[in-house]
């Protein structure tokens, strides 16, 4: 029989969150993990944290999970493999159009776009005469036009 450690038994279970606030520990999550309403990860103190949240919400950098015991755990956006393309004006708008047309999550900055690395998408961006660079960076894409909790998918007007 092997000894069971405290960290293997104790898990913080979080059913609530708030937008900001002080926290005693943090958990670093990539965009995919922050997009899940349920999940589990190791916090900065090496103990597990599990979250069970309302569907349809992406956790943002700096938000705070609240455990059943009242402990507060800050969400940190983890660096991940992203592509970034720099352009101005209509060239940037054209790249944004093509990325959006493929329903990709896109982060928008001042004269740049960032998306999760994908060689096929990088080739498409190259075909527009632009040159994506590869980075390891936190990814904070825009929420979609239909992402509010009251919409479960696309809403079409008659």
At which residue positions do the language-model features occur?
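A common structural junction motif
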Residues: 70, 103, 129-133
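Short, ordered loop/turn segments at secondary-structure junctions
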Residues: 70, 78-80, 120, 137
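Short, charged beta-turn/beta-strand-edge "cap" motif at the junction between a beta-strand
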Residues: 55-57, 66, 70-74
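Mid-chain, well-packed structural core segment of small domains
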Residues: 76-114
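Helix-rich terminal scaffold detector
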Residues: 1-22, 116, 120-158
């Amino acid at each position: 029989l092997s000894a069971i450690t405290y960290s293997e038994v104790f898990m913080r279970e979080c059913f609530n969150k708030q937008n900001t606030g002080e926290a005693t520990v943090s958990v670093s999550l990539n965009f995919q993990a922050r997009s899940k309403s349920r999940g589990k990860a190791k916090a900065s103190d090496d103990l597990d944290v599990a979250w069970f949240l309302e569907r349809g919400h992406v956790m943002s950098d700096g938000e705070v999970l609240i455990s059943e015991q009242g402990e507060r755990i800050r969400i940190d956006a983890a660096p991940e493999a992203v592509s970034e393309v720099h352009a101005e004006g209509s060239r940037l708008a054209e790249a944004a159009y093509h990325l959006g047309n493929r329903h990709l999550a896109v982060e928008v900055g001042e004269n740049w776009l960032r998306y999760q690395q994908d060689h096929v998408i990088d080739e498409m961006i190259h075909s527009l005469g632009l040159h994506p660079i590869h980075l390891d960076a936190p990814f904070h894409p825009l929420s979609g036009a239909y992402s509010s909790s009251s919409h479960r998918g696309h809403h079409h007007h008659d």
